[in-house]
A protein has these predicted regions:
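Surface-exposed cap/loop segments at beta↔alpha junctions
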Residues: 46-141
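Short conserved beta-strand and strand-loop elements enriched in small hydrophobics
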Residues: 4, 53-62, 312-320
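Oligomerization/assembly interface segments of phage tail-like spikes and tubes
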Residues: 30-45, 79-91, 167, 237, ...
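Trimeric viral appendage architectures of receptor-binding fibers, tailspike depolymerases
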Residues: 1-18, 31, 216, 345, ...
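Amphipathic, non-transmembrane alpha-helical segments in extracytoplasmic/periplasmic proteins
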Residues: 31, 40, 85, 102-138, ...
């Protein structure tokens, strides 16, 4: 079985306390933009299990590194110990974005990948308040990016992990943390953060080797396909102001007919109206993709992991049963080790429709603002613009989104809502004794 190296944190650096190669099972989920989890089960009576007692971190290879967050010891006929935790980059969730002294926001105007690196640097390593510094961390800045493609990040009190996840998901950026020998003293180890971009290995490109999944190619053992037609792809973002004077912007206004799925985003906290397009783009990214595949790869293809494909790469799925062909990004890879068995499970596309993500969307209280700049930054936009200047829209579009014809409006006073909302409304009496008035929109 593959060795798992176990580390303890000390003031001088991370210290190797033991190596485990006799575990019962080990599963580790790596994610491109998010943060995965892992679980390790072993017999507590073994010599190795006793050596690693009190460990803080684990490492199997580049990227498969985790922080220990939970320990369970089931003492019965067998003394079973189970360690659980998250990917090593999950340590970022222990910090919030603190602005510099005498500043309302932490402002960074760079390429999205460099923004992530600067957030890591200012909030984990070179903090204004030295009590916030997490020791034994290094940030790798070797990524090559287009410096003309910029966003403006203005962070204030948002969770560091959430902020990075938002940017990484919106801009298809990968990030991870690994354990490496300390540069100043290789007797100790340190945590190193990396930011990277996956490689395009899809069918219709010729620069890189292709990564094509297909049952007839015998590289898929099992698959679970999910398509959801209700994922929003067009966002009406409403900023400051009231009524017809409220600043608004439509992201991806080119979608038409039944292919257009609209969502309203309340962005009244955004002071600068040029930030509205990016707020819409990042919120749309949270809803995930229409297509999502969960696939168990064949054993032969699993052996090519790290050489023929890697987390974050773009490939192509040719599903003969459904008659579809789609390009996808490898957003999640789970390695499962049990005795002498090894399997690889992958997720293609972002699946953000689970309950936890929905709650996060509705309860997020971050005061972070992002502004996109540069011709290559994308993000859609209304009125045919490049995305950085909000275009005026007909206020009736807001009314039709929030209160379509047939909607009911409750009021504690007898005032026709048309005076503030527009449209035509009539009093609606459902019967019974009510302490409020009800209006129904007719046109």
């Amino acid at each position: 079985m593959k060795e798992i190296r176990c580390y303890k944190n000390t003031p001088n650096g991370l210290v190797l306390v033991g190596v485990i190669d006799d575990y019962q099972s080990f599963s580790f989920t790596r994610t491109y933009s998010d943060c995965g989890e892992w679980q390790l089960t072993l017999n507590g009576d073994t010599k190795n299990a006793k050596l690693v007692k009190g460990m803080n971190y684990i490492s199997m290879n580049n990227g498969v590194c985790g922080v220990v967050e939970q320990l369970e010891n089931n003492v019965g006929s067998n003394n079973i110990i189970t360690y659980k935790g998250s990917e090593l980059k999950g340590i970022t969730s222990s910090r919030i974005v603190m602005p510099p002294n005498n500043s309302a926001y932490l402002t960074i105007k760079k390429n999205p990948a460099l923004v992530i690196l600067d957030i890591l640097n200012t909030q984990l390593v070179n903090c204004t308040d030295r009590r916030r510094i997490i020791p034994n961390i290094r940030i790798d800045n070797s990524i090559e990016v287009d410096t003309t493609d910029k966003i403006e990040f203005n962070g204030r009190f948002g969770n560091v992990y959430d902020e990075i996840n938002t940017i990484a998901t919106a801009y298809n950026i990968g990030w991870y943390a690994t354990i490496e020998p300390k540069q100043s003293n290789n007797q100790y180890a340190e945590i190193v953060f990396y930011v990277y971009h996956g490689i395009d290995r899809s069918k219709n490109q010729s620069t890189n080797s292709r990564f094509i999944l297909r049952y007839s190619n015998d590289n898929i053992e099992q698959s679970d396909y999910q398509y959801i037609d209700t994922i929003p792809n067009t966002a009406l973002v409403a900023g400051k102001g009231e009524g017809i004077n409220r600043k608004t912007y439509i992201v991806n206004d080119t979608a038409i007919g039944l292919n257009r799925k609209e969502v309203y985003i309340d962005a009244r906290d955004v002071e600068d109206e040029t930030l509205l397009p990016q707020r819409g783009k990042e919120k749309l990214a949270e809803y995930g993709d229409n297509n999502s595949y969960q696939i168990t790869l064949s054993r032969n293809l699993s052996k090519q992991y790290h050489s023929a494909f890697e987390l974050g790469d773009i490939g192509t799925i040719q599903d003969d049963l459904l008659g579809i062909e789609i390009d996808f990004r490898l957003t999640e890879i789970t390695e499962v080790y049990e005795s002498d068995d090894f399997r690889l499970e992958v997720v293609c596309g972002y699946d953000k429709k689970d309950l936890g993500s929905a709650i996060k969307r509705s309860t997020s209280n971050t005061e972070t603002l992002l502004k996109i700049e540069g011709s290559g930054s994308g993000g859609g936009g209304g009125g045919g613009g490049g995305g950085s200047t909000p275009q005026p829209i007909d206020p009736s579009q807001i009314l039709n989104l929030v209160y379509p014809i047939g909607s009911l409006y409750l009021s504690i006073n007898n005032v026709n809502p048309s005076s503030s909302l527009g449209g035509t409304w009539v009093r609606f009496d459902p019967g019974g004794k009510l302490t409020y008035y009800m209006w129904k929109r007719t046109q």
